[in-house]
């Protein structure tokens, strides 16, 4: 497309009248005219003579000064001829005329700004179908709120372009500027994604290094094997984090797309009926990668496999941590630690207690890496992450219960026989390894735990929860009862905790057996971890009236088809 001839002209600083549209433009339909609806400023404001008269396409010419009033008639004829020759199929601003935005800036001057993220800046006034599709989806089709939001930052149905222009209205973070001044969408910061993973590795090294220090400095037993064990655990966790992020490499992109569609979706095309418009809006809100079943939300798809390999990582840690502590508690090394170590048994207690923040860092590292932007926090978690938080709190209470039993050995207040001492150590490490069960349960779950099904992930979840209660709470309650009866120990509040957890898990198992063969009602589905069933799909839109059925059938998807449909209808 050749630029118009004539001397370069700068922006005018004095009010000037605009030339009438040429005869070739008057013969075209209204939505194909370029520059028929050009805004004007008031008598006190200054106006532009180049960008506004070209329909807002940004045809600014650099060069020396010169006002539009000093241009000759030949130059204007050349300009008009150039406009009529290079007239695009759908102009940038005159596709759907509307009222000007606040401040006197016309819609034609602001429409290309909304579509600047998809179109490359050129010196011509043409606009492709993709550019119009982005601009129509962002501002024009969205309604009058979108047109006013572009110029004045207002809010409306289609105010997506203005919402993400400088910052995200959902997560509140400023967007990063891309190439040529474009704005990128919402994106999670790398620090939030990798912070808890780095903290997990630091806690692994700290706990393993302190235990190695106790074993090597006090007894000098197999120091190479202890250090090699720590290195194997750290490398295994690093491989777990790498495989977890690689397995969900496409997850953040789908989550970002669904997050953008959820908060910045535009209205469906104008030529669709009401039922089809509702279906298009539901599709925009539901996301592209969601499953069609119940509970398919924007964040559910990305969270389906986020706990993969987590149970293996914790199992490796439990296997490596157990022999070190058993060797210290079961031999005379504990007495040597009290005599030679800097902090004595207090430092050993703190080293054992690092398992709880390590488990917390593991759960948060998985949740932060898979969560969509703006969903961090205890009140905005996905169903699986709510389940993980509840299981973590239960495991913390179980570890605290078993650790108080181990402290009876450390203090020496109660003369326990050898078999009871080993039983206490076995119960402690059984409690330490219990997160493997619920991490595996979260891994085998699909989009969300389905409690109302007779087989599949729901039955597996009930079985694993009941098994975890029997393996942890029953031995702890039996040991507490034995200490109360045989060794005159006082009653502990942890006995009530064990009874409460056993009762809750038993009720869950009975509820699953009672509801066998029946689906969950919608009211119970809303109160449980699952999501309510989705509404039935809307009926297909009726065929359009008139002679443009062929254009609707061929070009029915998206703004591109909408533009081509308008062109076919105008030709008919």
UniProtKB/Swiss-Prot annotation:
Renumbered residue ranges of the record's region Disordered: 1-123, 525-572
A matching Pfam family: CECR6_TMEM121
Keyword DNA damage in record: no
Compositional bias (Gly residues): 55-67
UniProt KW keywords: Phosphoprotein
Top-level taxonomic group: Eukaryota
InterPro entries: CECR6 (IPR026624), CECR6/TMEM121 (IPR032776)
UniProt feature, compositional bias: Pro residues: 533-545
Cystine pairs: none
Biased composition (Low complexity): 44-54, 88-123
Residue numbers bearing the Phosphoserine modification: 162, 165, 548
Family recorded in the similarity comment: Belongs to the TMEM121 family.
Protein name: Transmembrane protein 121B
Organism: Mus musculus (Mouse)
Gene, per the UniProt record: Tmem121b
